[in-house]
């Protein structure tokens, strides 16, 4: 009986945590989705962004009390501009998706929305974490040894 309870708790924690990618696994996945060089942005920059925004966690969320928005998923895409969570006042939903779609282990929708974000004039500078931790820095460490 104790084994079943422990197993249940372990499975529940995995479900709540979502998928946390290994660094090279994510690098290969993002490359397969066409992010390497997309809009002139290197794969290493995308990896740096994902590291600092979510620590490679698909279920990461962050509430922003100022505008009552929430950042979602591996790229921490914001509900004020890019997705619909049904709670953010004045939301634009430029990616035309539910914010919950950004929390899936399958990051297809998250990648598609990230591509939409960088098509705007700000490009990758839309992400504060990228500006703080990746811009004008050697980001090669994020793909080093991954064979991508």
Swiss-Prot record:
Catalysed conversion reaction: Hydrolysis of (1->4)-beta-linkages between N-acetylmuramic acid and N-acetyl-D-glucosamine residues in a peptidoglycan and between N-acetyl-D-glucosamine residues in chitodextrins
An annotated GO BP: defense response to Gram-negative bacterium
Domain C-type lysozyme intervals: 19-148
InterPro entries: Glyco_hydro_22 (IPR001916), Glyco_hydro_22_CS (IPR019799), Glyco_hydro_22_lys (IPR000974), Lysozyme-like_dom_sf (IPR023346)
Keywords: Antimicrobial, Bacteriolytic enzyme, Disulfide bond, Glycosidase, Hydrolase, Signal
Family: Belongs to the glycosyl hydrolase 22 family.
SUBUNIT field: Monomer.
Protein name stated in the entry: Lysozyme C
Native organism: Callithrix jacchus
